[in-house]
């Protein structure tokens, strides 16, 4: 079996994907028309042209503009269902999706509308596509601690539907320490915790996520390599890094995929996984990310399998289910 066949055959878990970042131009245009919302683009082609950006902030500007068309429960359902269909094509059998309630509640869309649409899509994905899923609620780090506390309060009645809380949006200037008290409260309430750190931000942010937020996983974390002591800790603690190669390329975290450090991290014993982040904006879903790193870094079949195994080991599914998928990978 060659590498491209193996990539298609491997079952995978996706642990770092923003549901708002799966918004394809065609669906954005369709929902904007359905909801009679003016967007600054007259066609799908114009939206596609706008998906041309060079850093995290210019991407976020477009990302939030797109999210403005999401108003009704059906909109959130359609968004998630379109992503699940992509998962089915890529043999992503389990996904843990981020959603950003503050992006919607500050526009007057209720927390309940967002969650109900996503929940319904999750249920249908399990029933019709055999894909399991968890929801992870993210706090926007460019907003205040007070705003994050309010969002956490809104989530408390839905603890059964939200497995973890996370931290995303503009990283630089918004260290994890800003939200230490919010994350302490979230942990007390029984949520697992993850956080974006070490993408554009320095290794110090990864230390803070570990020590102050007490995370179960680090999202991105590729800049950890700059700090040997941090690397040692990540390896010792088997701390997962949910790495997003095409995202790193598109946002100029790396200038060339051949420079990406995912293979080095993997071979040094860091628990790295492959993910798509915001696939509609970054030009690729799960398998596209695997294909890109395989082509650039010449990954072996064993390395590809290890990345797939890592995705299940780092997931929040139960141990028996993890072992079943890992066994299947080992038999391929």
UniProtKB/Swiss-Prot annotation:
GO terms for biological process: adenine catabolic process; hypoxanthine salvage; nucleotide metabolic process. Substrate binds at residue 278. Zn(2+) binds at residues 16, 18, 196, 277. It is an enzyme of class 3 (hydrolase). Binds 1 zinc ion per subunit. Belongs to the metallo-dependent hydrolases superfamily. Adenosine and AMP deaminases family. Adenine deaminase type 2 subfamily. Keywords: Hydrolase, Metal-binding, Nucleotide metabolism, Zinc. GO terms for molecular function: adenine deaminase activity; zinc ion binding. The keyword Nucleotide-binding does not apply. The keyword Hydrolase applies. NCBIfam families: aden_deam, PRK09358.1-6. The active site is at residue 199. The record marks 220 as: Important for catalytic activity. This is Adenine deaminase. Pfam families: A_deaminase (PF00962). Its EC number is 3.5.4.2. Signal peptide: none annotated. Its cofactor is Zn(2+). InterPro entries: A_deaminase_dom (IPR001365), ADE (IPR028892), Ado/ade_deaminase (IPR006330), Metal_Hydrolase (IPR032466). Coiled coil: none annotated. It catalyses: adenine + H2O + H(+) = hypoxanthine + NH4(+). Catalyzes the hydrolytic deamination of adenine to hypoxanthine. Plays an important role in the purine salvage pathway and in nitrogen catabolism. One of its GO terms (cellular component) is cytosol. Gene3D superfamilies: Metal-dependent hydrolases.
